[in-house]
Amino acid sequence: MKTVIRNFSHTFRRFFTASILNILGLSIAFASFFVIMTQVDYDYNFNKGYKDYEKIFRIEINPNPDSGWQLWTPRPLCEQLQSASPYIKSISQVESYQPEDEYEVNGNLFKATTCTGFGNFLETFQPEMINGSADALNQPKTVLLSESTAKKFFGTTDVIGQTIFRGKQADNNAWTIGGVYKDYPENSQIRNWVMMPKEADTDKGNWKNWNYICYMRLESPSAAPEIEKLILQIFVKNFPEL
């Protein structure tokens, strides 16, 4: 071992510049490999943080060749689809835009991203609940917080029944916390947001407002081709001009 070290030291002193360049080259190679593999892991595991993720699908529509594929859908499309097939275990509709809102909690102001949808729109993703129940979203003026958001607002996850205000308290827009769910991985479409239900009648029967993203959980991934046909049938029936 001493001989190896002595030879290395001798070579390093004799070929100083070349040795430095070799070390720098190896360092850059290892750093590049680490960065690339980190990105590969991020992409490979994208959206795999959900329970039985392979059963979850997002609806995308291509109305005509000129418009291309899009993920925005009207509310009635998803509701008709849910009742059209026994292979669909649940459907979740969320607003296509998640704003960063200000929240007042015990006199302190925080910023957090808000996701709104209809009913228990987390049912499709089956979050691991730390406290409370995801079904709390079926109650008006009741929200779910992620684990990290609960700790940010209150310093703890034991927050069931606590009140937060969307905006400032003076705005009188109070919401009760009905549950805390475990954080999703960063490489997920549904993130660690304040989950908030919309009013039940919003856009009900309205085919003109394409403002929602629709996710569904199937009994089996093999049912996807049949569901695609159902989507097309419902779409053609309600938009024969396209």
What would you call each of these model-derived segments?
Residues C115-N131, V143-L242:
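Mid-to-C-terminal secondary-structure elements
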